[in-house]
């Protein structure tokens, strides 16, 4: 061990490893906060109700709404359930999931094809009439339409 400590190569490699690892750690840690602030910088009066935006503000604002809270909880749960059905050891469960998914997709496509006229753009119909029949975003606390397309 004494011979190893005397060699200058050992000290250069140790110093180089320490410097490179510290540079990498600093480079990875520093821009994350500034990048987050740049992405969520308020560019208009309506972004996060005019406040300087951050991820914490967005999450806190979103979770105050009961519907958003349900979606926040349901999204990971639905992904986990989908993965459980797809990767289940019991082939009957997996096949049931695939058949149900295929059936729902076919029913949706048939419903869209029945209602869409030949002269109308299918994507426009799906967006305006089927998915967004109210013509705007509804306020969950009151039944009135907040924004209406003209």
From Swiss-Prot:
- What Pfam families is this protein classified in? DUF3713 (PF12506)
Leader sequence range is 1-27
| InterPro entries named among the record's database cross-references | DUF3713
Which domain of life does this protein belong to?
A: Bacteria
Coiled-coil stretches noted in the UniProt entry, renumbered to this chain: none
Which terms in the GO cellular component ontology are assigned?
side of membrane
Subcellular localization is given as: Membrane
KW Glycoprotein (keyword) present: yes
Give the record's keywords alphabetically.
Glycoprotein, GPI-anchor, Lipoprotein, Membrane, Palmitate, Signal
Q: What family name appears in the similarity comment?
A: Belongs to the MG307/MG309/MG338 family.
Task: Name it.
Answer: Uncharacterized lipoprotein MPN_442
| Organism from which the protein derives | Mycoplasma pneumoniae (strain ATCC 29342 / M129 / Subtype 1) (Mycoplasmoides pneumoniae)
């Amino acid at each position: 061990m004494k011979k190893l400590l005397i060699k200058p190569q050992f000290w250069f490699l140790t110093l180089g490893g320490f410097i490179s690892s510290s540079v990498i750690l600093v480079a990875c840690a520093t821009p994350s906060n500034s990048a987050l602030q740049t992405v969520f910088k308020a560019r208009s009066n309506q972004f996060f109700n005019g406040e300087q935006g951050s991820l914490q503000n967005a999450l806190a604002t979103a979770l105050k709404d009961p519907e958003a809270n349900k979606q926040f909880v349901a999204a990971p749960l639905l992904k986990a359930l989908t993965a459980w059905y797809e990767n289940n050891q019991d082939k009957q469960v997996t096949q049931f999931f695939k058949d149900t998914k295929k059936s729902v997709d076919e029913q949706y496509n048939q419903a869209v094809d029945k209602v869409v006229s030949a002269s109308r753009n299918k994507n426009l119909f799906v967006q305006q009439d089927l998915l967004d029949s109210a013509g705007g975003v509804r306020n969950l606390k009151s039944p009135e339409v907040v924004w209406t397309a003209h």
